[in-house]
Design a protein with these regions (language model features):
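Canonical radical SAM enzyme core domain
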Residues: 5-18
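Auxiliary Fe-S-binding modules of radical SAM enzymes
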Residues: 17, 21-126
Length: 126
């Protein structure tokens, strides 16, 4: 199952909590997360430019991911494609959950958000 930040800023919290509940009920073998990058020529970027979609900042994406992880109760393999958390992927999610939350919390407090945003802006493809 894949988790993506599609609810935007206005629904971020409820999206993270409710998605974690649904994911946990499904008991997936694998949960993956990917950051949301708005590419030129896509409808979602056009919606953001018109003010109809409010994408998250890098810090807000990390905060949403942390909230999702805190609420996820499925013992699965966990893979994240976020820049700061690549070393947190692997099996046995529940035994590593506290470590993942701590790493995300550290990134939220001390991460170089400008560098992360620049990395995302420079992406040309998935």
């Amino acid at each position: 199952m894949e988790y993506i930040y599609l609810a935007g800023r206005s629904h971020s919290r409820e999206h993270a909590v409710n998605s974690a509940k649904i994911f946990s009920q499904c008991k997936p073998m694998l949960v993956g997360t990917g950051g949301l990058t708005l590419f030129p020529g896509t409808p979602l970027l056009e919606e953001a430019q018109r003010g109809e979609f409010d994408p998250l900042t890098e810090k807000e994406m990390l905060e949403e991911l942390k909230l999702f992880v805190e609420n996820l109760t499925a013992d699965c393999s966990f893979i994240t494609h976020h820049t700061v958390a690549a070393n947190l992927t692997g099996p046995n999610f529940l035994s590593r959950k506290d470590k993942i939350v701590a790493a995300l919390d550290h990134a939220i407090r001390h991460g170089d958000m400008d560098r992360m945003a620049a990395y995302r802006r420079n992406k040309r493809t998935l």
